[in-house]
Amino acid sequence: MTRRYWNINLEEMMEAGVHFGHGTRKWDPRMAPYISAKRKGIHITNLTRTARFLSEACDLVFDAASRGKHFLIVGTKDKAADSVASAAIRARCHYVNKKWLGGMSTNWSTTETRLQKFRDLRVRAEMGQFSRLPKRDAAILKRQLSHFQTYLGGIKYMTGLPDIVIIIDQQEEYTALRECVTLGIPTICLIDTNCDPDLADIPIPANDDAIASIRLILNKLVSAICQGRSSYIRSR
């Protein structure tokens, strides 16, 4: 894998609060190699290591995107949801930003069935078919459509399992991570000082609670994906 320059700036990361971890009582000892100090009861992440792993992750997604691979971004907590959606849309990635439904990837046949029903309901709504139904029936279908849009809206164009999954907050998205591990899908995880770095293929030690930190990491990754996609389009 060719290493590239991704303009990862330590000062920029400090301004975004990427280096702030959790309280020293809430930590995973396996994160010790990624922690540089303690300050006022808080662990401080070693940003040099963060930059190294973020650069490695950018190289990986660039190479994958340049070969036409597909990505899924997962981040369902309130602080991450909007950033996940906007980053994914910008890079034409699939995303889950409300709730990971158990078995979404390991029970892919069920997910496919749900997606097909979601597509059918969208078509019926666009054709105005709901207005021709009894009010009660139309209301039921509208509720189903709204439910699907909330939980499956970010993956409505998925036709198969993703090639790489980017996860924001390992602990919050533990079910999604375990499903990826089970299926052998490579993962890039934003991990705070209370996480297990060994669970991800590429862990990126960073503050997973600050919106600015989440947005900065995502912006670097999707920028690399967009560049990779451009390379893929030019080579076709």
From Swiss-Prot:
Ribonucleoprotein keyword on record: yes
Native source organism of the sequence: Nymphaea alba (White water-lily)
Family statement: Belongs to the universal ribosomal protein uS2 family.
Pfam entry (one): Ribosomal_S2
Record keywords, A-Z: Chloroplast, Plastid, Ribonucleoprotein, Ribosomal protein
Keyword Isomerase attributed: no
GO annotation (BP), single: translation
The protein's name in its UniProt record: Small ribosomal subunit protein uS2c
Protein localization: Plastid, Chloroplast
GO function terms (MF aspect): structural constituent of ribosome
Any one cellular-component term (Gene Ontology): mitochondrial small ribosomal subunit
UniProt-listed SUPFAM superfamilies: Ribosomal protein S2 (SSF52313)
InterPro entries the record matches: Ribosomal_uS2, Ribosomal_uS2_bac/mit/plastid, Ribosomal_uS2_CS, Ribosomal_uS2_flav_dom_sf
